Curated annotation (Swiss-Prot):
It is found in: Cytoplasm. Heterohexamer, formed by a dimer of trimers. The hexameric TusBCD complex contains 2 copies each of TusB, TusC and TusD. The TusBCD complex interacts with TusE. HAMAP family: Thiourid_synth_C. GO terms for cellular component: cytoplasm. Pfam families: DsrE. The lineage of its organism: Bacteria, Pseudomonadati, Pseudomonadota, Gammaproteobacteria, Enterobacterales. Belongs to the DsrF/TusC family. This is Protein TusC. InterPro entries: DsrEFH-like (IPR027396), Sulphur_relay_DsrE/F-like (IPR003787), Sulphur_relay_TusC (IPR037450), Sulphur_relay_TusC/DsrF (IPR017462). It comes from Cronobacter sakazakii (strain ATCC BAA-894) (Enterobacter sakazakii). Keywords: Cytoplasm, tRNA processing. Part of a sulfur-relay system required for 2-thiolation of 5-methylaminomethyl-2-thiouridine (mnm(5)s(2)U) at tRNA wobble positions. Its main location: cytoplasm. One of its GO terms (biological process) is tRNA processing.
Length: 119
């Protein structure tokens, strides 16, 4: 079975990319167990708790990331440099457990995947 990587690069509100990526991720989990999830650039905001999307008339889908372990999706990575550029750190609380890696290590991990989908 092919290994599939989901890369979140967009902020959670303002576009539907994050929600669509999460929907695709959950759907793909029925087809393969070889899934990796990567958060880089503004995508690091996808898994920050305490957001209030209703204030900008958006749907709150962020808490749905919490179900990933129930779907056996446990390989989740976040870009250390992206966090630092946005004033965050790897010690910050996120809605899921993620492993912080530098950009070079993230590229190496992504090279292991047959298919890379970016949202």
């Amino acid at each position: 079975m092919k290994q599939v990587a989901f890369v979140f690069t967009q902020a959670p509100h303002g576009t539907s990319a994050g929600r669509e990526g999460l929907d695709a991720l959950l759907a793909m989990s029925a087809l393969t167990e070889e899934i990796g999830v990567f958060f880089l650039s503004d995508g690091v905001f996808q898994i920050l708790p305490g957001q209030h999307p209703q204030a900008v008339l958006s749907r709150d889908y962020i808490s749905t990331f919490k179900v990933l372990p129930l779907y056996d999706i446990e390989r989740c990575y976040i870009c250390r440099e992206s966090l630092q550029e946005r004033g965050l750190s790897e010690e910050h609380a996120f809605v899921i457990d993620v492993e912080a890696l530098d950009a070079a290590a993230l590229r190496e991990r992504l090279d292991d995947y047959d298919v890379v989908l970016t949202f």
